[in-house]
Amino acid sequence: MNGPLPRPIDILPHRDPFLFVDELTRLEPGQSAAGTWRLSGDEFFFPGHFPGRPTLPGVLMCEAIAQVGAIAVLTDQRFAGKLPLFGGLDRARFRRQVVPGDTLWLEVELGRMSSRAGKGSGQALIGGADGDLACSCDLLFVVVDG
């Protein structure tokens, strides 16, 4: 995408404390997106997961990946004003623990998209695009009227 990238909060319906994408780093509407999530340690889930050894829950990594995928979907003109929901999650693998102070690089490549559903593959890496793989998964989106 040419020009400045939009802010995730201007595209996604999610809000604090459930908005997990701080900024976009790449966007090809309807095709792919990448962004970052900086984990300060002040997030709501760290005190209870796990006391004395705070670790990002794996399902929240998948949610963060899905939010980046939702940005790729929602910036496609066919889906403007729609709401992409999780339709499924396949082949999720968790390779590294993510802890306070880490920055996740989140990226998604969309596959087939119909007018009501689509697929994508995503991953979360610690530290940047060339960082350590923390999570990978395949996503199924269902798109409904917003």
Locations of regions flagged by a protein language model:
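Catalytic strand-loop segment that frames the active site of acyl-thioester-processing enzymes
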Residues: 16-56
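Hydrophobic beta-strand-centered segment that forms part of the acyl-chain substrate-binding groove
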Residues: 2, 69-107, 134-141
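Hydrophobic/aromatic beta-strand elements that line small-molecule binding cavities or substrate pockets
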Residues: 22-23, 90-92, 122-124
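Compact, glycine-rich, soluble single-domain proteins
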Residues: 47-73, 86
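HotDog/MaoC-like acyl-thioester-processing domains
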Residues: 29-30, 98-102, 107-146
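Flexible, low-complexity linker/boundary loops enriched in proline and small hydrophobic residues
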Residues: 1-25, 141
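Beta-strand-rich interaction surfaces with strong enrichment in secreted/lumenal proteins
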Residues: 9, 52, 94-96
